[in-house]
Amino acid sequence: MKVLKFGGTSVGSVKSILSLKRIVEKEAESQPVIVVVSALGGITDKLIVTARLALQGDEGWRNEFEAMVDRHHKMIDTIITDTKKREDLFNTVDGMFEQLRSIYYGVFLIHDLSEKTLDAIVSYGERLSSNIVATLISKARWFDARDFIICLLYTSDAAD
């Protein structure tokens, strides 16, 4: 079994994500593969900036948020060619974005952004991109890392 980890640049553009697909599918011909992906390039920073805008009571958080939604939608529209898979993925991704919008709105309303809340916000980057990649790659299945990673301390760098 091989674990392949791809950073944000590897999932940052249509060209790079299609290259990732080729690499994974080639490796999977000879052995089982686990794929770990970062958020789309630049999304982690945008998630944090949007959280800080919401914390400051700046309505601009909504524009930043919509830009993230648009970026993910464009990626999906471009790389997922099967209509049914694309529709299912849009439903999944849009559900996640609705959760994220609610979190941002809560931060905006109460002017509080705990470390735990920021960690939850940032986690959406990887969760969104991993759903996209799992849909793109032939015979792939998506697993939610939260189901099997145990965190002993609740800090931004404490996953074990």
Regions found by a protein language model. Name each.
Residues 1-156:
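Nucleotide/pyrophosphate-binding catalytic subdomain
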